[in-house]
């Protein structure tokens, strides 16, 4: 079904707004995936703070023009699903990577983060980024381990002092 010019402009504006507020983007080919599976993906995406849209390639190219995700334009061939992470940079990559494991026909084409293109083979780099809470927990564990090590060294020095005095 042909889209009217006003509809096309609205789609480009909507996707462009999502791109401007996004932290990262992932492009994928959803050909052969059932409607039920796509509905489940969209539900998970909403819960994870990811904007997902199936867009015509020409409209997708125009929507990302002038944004940090312009490097994705070369991946817009065939049926294109584009996902923008709005809350966490790795959310869309993690979501689509997990979905690709479940669906044999689903293929991730590539991702973009801070203006850099990430090929599909290296999508794990983006998907494995820790969330804010995970990063805080890692920092706290590092600080805790450092203070424990300092405490152990202090006790060892105190023991050495007492042995020398005795």
UniProtKB/Swiss-Prot annotation:
Keywords: Ribonucleoprotein, Ribosomal protein, RNA-binding, rRNA-binding. One of its GO terms (cellular component) is large ribosomal subunit. GO terms for molecular function: large ribosomal subunit rRNA binding; structural constituent of ribosome. InterPro entries: Ribosomal_uL10, Ribosomal_uL10-like_sf, Ribosomal_uL10_bac, Ribosomal_uL10_bac_type, Ribosomal_uL10_CS_bac. Signal peptide: none annotated. The keyword Electron transport does not apply. Pfam families: Ribosomal_L10. It comes from the Bacteria. CDD domains: Ribosomal_L10. GO terms for biological process: translation. Belongs to the universal ribosomal protein uL10 family. PANTHER family: 39S RIBOSOMAL PROTEIN L10, MITOCHONDRIAL. Forms part of the ribosomal stalk, playing a central role in the interaction of the ribosome with GTP-bound translation factors. Part of the ribosomal stalk of the 50S ribosomal subunit. The N-terminus interacts with L11 and the large rRNA to form the base of the stalk. The C-terminus forms an elongated spine to which L12 dimers bind in a sequential fashion forming a multimeric L10(L12)X complex. This is Large ribosomal subunit protein uL10. The lineage of its organism: Bacteria, Pseudomonadati, Pseudomonadota, Gammaproteobacteria, Alteromonadales.
């Amino acid at each position: 079904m042909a889209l009217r010019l006003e509809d096309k402009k609205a789609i480009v504006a909507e996707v462009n707004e999502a791109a401007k507020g996004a932290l990262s983007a992932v492009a994928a080919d959803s050909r052969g995936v059932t409607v039920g599976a796509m509905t489940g993906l969209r539900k998970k995406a909403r819960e994870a703070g990811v904007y997902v849209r199936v867009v015509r390639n020409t409209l997708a190219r125009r929507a990302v023009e002038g944004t940090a995700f312009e490097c994705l334009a070369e991946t817009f061939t065939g049926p294109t699903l584009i996902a923008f992470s709005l809350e966490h940079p790795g959310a869309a990559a993690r979501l689509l990577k997990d979905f690709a494991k479940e669906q044999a026909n689903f293929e991730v084409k590539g991702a973009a983060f801070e203006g850099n293109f990430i090929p599909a083979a290296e999508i794990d780099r983006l998907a494995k980024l820790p969330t804010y809470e995970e990063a805080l927990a890692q920092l706290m564990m590092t600080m805790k381990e450092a203070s424990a090590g300092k405490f152990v060294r202090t006790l060892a020095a105190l023991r050495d002092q007492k042995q020398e005095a005795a």
